[in-house]
Amino acid sequence: MARPEIIILAAIAGKNRVIGKDGKLPWHISEDLKRFKRLTIGYPVLMGRKTFESIVERLGKPLPERRSLVLTSKSLAEHPDVESYPSIESALAAIAGEEKIFVIGGERVFKETLEMADGLELTIVEGDYDGDAFFPEYEEIIENRFSLTLKEGKDGFRFETYEKRQ
């Protein structure tokens, strides 16, 4: 059975690739959160433990209407509807019949999946932000393997969609 299409979904500070600080986004962009929801509803989402914990802290529960797969060696028994896996490979094997999966962070998970990604949905936030989590260097990978299929500028940020070249 073919593996699902892997889409990386991230909001990144344009100048220094910051994606987080103290387990939180360093910005609040309502339009980006709405886009995140619209893209991911009904699809599995893959994340690291810290990203999962920050979502639960913010929402009081895991993401609704999505199958949450968390990369961790720790038990998530308090969240029986959330699946935990020790590796990306085991998580992907568990969803082999799915059409696509969205990788939603954090830093380590982005690093480990960037090379295998089939697409990227990025929000590039203008400015230089203080942070402790960073998106991996991606410009060369995009240049060599992806085509920009959508670029939508907004006030202070832009959405960019990249698809893998055939």
Q: What does each of the following model-derived ranges do?
A:
Residues 2-166:
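Enzymes that bind and transform nitrogen-containing heteroaromatic metabolites
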